[in-house]
């Protein structure tokens, strides 16, 4: 059976709060790292979230 193209990733807050979101991405179509402005409930603001590999 073939291996799937989607990889699970973790989007971690750059505010240093330790908050993160998990999602998946297609590693063939988006080989670069993702960055999103998302809501961090710890600091109650929108901050930059960067992709790190999910262990």
UniProtKB/Swiss-Prot annotation:
According to the lineage, what is the superkingdom?
Bacteria
MF terms in GO: structural constituent of ribosome
- Report any one BP term from Gene Ontology: translation
| A Gene Ontology term for the protein's cellular component | cytosolic large ribosomal subunit
Pfam families the UniProt entry points to: Ribosomal_L33 (PF00471)
Gene3D superfamilies hit by this protein: Ribosomal protein L33
| Keywords, sorted A to Z | Ribonucleoprotein, Ribosomal protein
Q: Which family does it belong to?
A: Belongs to the bacterial ribosomal protein bL33 family.
Q: What is the name listed in the Swiss-Prot or TrEMBL entry for this protein?
A: Large ribosomal subunit protein bL33
UniProt organism field: Aromatoleum aromaticum (strain DSM 19018 / LMG 30748 / EbN1) (Azoarcus sp. (strain EbN1))
Q: What is the lineage of its organism?
A: Bacteria, Pseudomonadati, Pseudomonadota, Betaproteobacteria, Rhodocyclales
């Amino acid at each position: 059976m073939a291996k799937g193209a989607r990889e699970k990733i973790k989007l971690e807050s750059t505010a240093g709060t330790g908050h993160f979101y998990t999602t998946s991405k297609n590693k063939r179509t988006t080989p670069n790292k993702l960055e999103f402005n998302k809501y961090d409930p710890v600091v109650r603001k929108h901050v930059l979230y960067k992709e790190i590999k999910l262990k």
